[in-house]
Amino acid sequence: MGSHMVWFLFLVSFFSVFPAPSESMVRHYKFNVVMKNVTRLCSSKPTVTVNGRYPGPTIYAREDDTLLIKVVNHVKYNVSIHWHGVRQVRTGWADGPAYITQCPIQPGQVYTYNYTLTGQRGTLWWHAHILWLRATVYGALVILPKRGVPYPFPKPDNEKVIVLGEWWKSDTENIINEALKSGLAPNVSDSHMINGHPGPVRNCPSQGYKLSVENGKTYLLRLVNAALNEELFFKVAGHIFTVVEVDAVYVKPFKTDTVLIAPGQTTNVLLTASKSAGKYLVTASPFMDAPIAVDNVTATATVHYSGTLSSSPTILTLPPPQNATSIANNFTNSLRSLNSKKYPALVPTTIDHHLFFTVGLGLNACPTCKAGNGSRVVASINNVTFIMPKTALLPAHYFNTSGVFTTDFPKNPPHVFNYSGGSVTNMATETGTRLYKLPYNATVQLVLQDTGVIAPENHPVHLHGFNFFEVGRGLGNFNSTKDPKNFNLVDPVERNTIGVPSGGWVVIRFRADNPGVWFMHCHLEVHTTWGLKMAFLVENGKGPNQSILPPPKDLPKC
């Protein structure tokens, strides 16, 4: 046998035992959904958790890895888990929103979510996608680059996951159920949370989260806003962040002392521990520039330099004012895609479907809603308040089950009016389970226009199954003649969750290259509950990898 053949056989045997560093892996996780007594704000309550942890466990993987996550439901509620921001290319069965892509996992039942992290790296997250269970059922999903592939920014010395949330002393299911009976808005949360801790609050001297750092080292903070209903500002006293990624997409780095992060969004920032030894206050506080009630309790934590005595005083900072629109706009307007050769911004430049969706609130008749004087607050897209079906939409589409949904969702508002101002006499909405159909690979431009019906408000809108580019935003009513002239088609930020500004509009573009049924909804949970949601039905293409895969055998049944 020649020396070349011996060497070849050695290499074959070597790589069969030691896989190449770039080879993707199959990673197995098990989520036991269980009740656990959790104490916060000096009171305890039975809480739905994953593996008895609040917040839930962080999932770690690498780009192109396959995840098999077995979810076992040990609680009295139906359960489903959404992997927020994961593209789920051809695997809509694993996306997770109950009654959209799957029937929920019933008590005592099991479902294994099986999907591949195709071409994605960065910080995403997971959460329950049924009822209000995501108040406590959530955690981070960290997707590292492939081995040997560096970050497109200076390598940090360490990484930390920071998940922001909200906490109610009362049972959240009772809170939303009572609100639905009354027709009014639910009670706001009792506190915000930083990695599951509020920090010391009035009448309850609890410990907050401590972020330990060493002088001179740089840390990558992976921020997630898992709050149900509130946009948040995030600050560290005396420190400046460098923003490097949002929604698992790299951005052109920029510096800021305040991060704005809406429910559903993720943001990666670099923090260099360049100050004198000490303890520095961390704040998570609400942003709301509309006359809407919010939880105004600021959650706090500390950045704790090594060698600092625990008795040392904490260096303080004031959070931004609740209505600090200019700070919010400065942050949002600084976001640009990296748009490098390795990470290009593939913005659609020709458009097949021009859509215009109004997003906002309304009032429908409710004779039993005594507190609401016979009316119920609802929410809608293009004046359609979405009604959840009794069975899941994706299986109904796949198996051609009739009578579950229609595909006549309006591409424009049924009534043209002064969306961002002026009074509206009829605030009623239509209801229905209506989808918008898109051919495979169609390009879409979608205008999301806030309305002032009842009150203007910032709506963080999340699209499942796709990333999209924000090509423009502004205040007032979108002008289809003037505003496109200012679109950014070169390096617009790429996201999966976008904030529609209060009293304004945002325009997104995406390519419908992922067949299936894909939910789009406001990520303020109260607005989703009220009906601010719809779904796109993306048809199969004609190529070999352009059709949705068959459903798994253990897909839950309704």
From Swiss-Prot:
GO CC terms of this entry: apoplast; plant-type cell wall
Keywords: Apoplast, Copper, Glycoprotein, Lignin degradation, Metal-binding, Oxidoreductase, Repeat, Secreted, Signal
Enzyme class: oxidoreductase
Plastocyanin-like domain boundaries: 32-148, 158-308, 408-542
Pfam families, per the entry: Cu-oxidase, Cu-oxidase_2, Cu-oxidase_3
Binding site for Cu cation 1: H82, H462
Primary localization: secreted
Compartments in which it is found: Secreted, Extracellular space, Apoplast
GO terms classed as biological process: lignin biosynthetic process; lignin catabolic process; plant-type secondary cell wall biogenesis
Signal peptide: 1-24
Tissue: Ubiquitous, with higher levels in the inflorescence stem.
Catalysed reactions, as listed in the record: 4 hydroquinone + O2 = 4 benzosemiquinone + 2 H2O
EC number(s) on file: 1.10.3.2
Residues bound to Cu cation 4: H459, C522, H527
Keyword Secreted in record: yes
Glycosylation sites: N37, N78, N114, N187, N296, N323, N330, N373, N383, N400, N418, N441, N479, N545
Cofactor note: Binds 4 Cu cations per monomer.
Membership in a protein family: Belongs to the multicopper oxidase family.
Function: Lignin degradation and detoxification of lignin-derived products. Required for secondary xylem cell wall lignification.
Protein name per Swiss-Prot or TrEMBL: Laccase-4
Source organism: Arabidopsis thaliana (Mouse-ear cress)
Phylogenetic lineage: Eukaryota, Viridiplantae, Streptophyta, Embryophyta, Tracheophyta
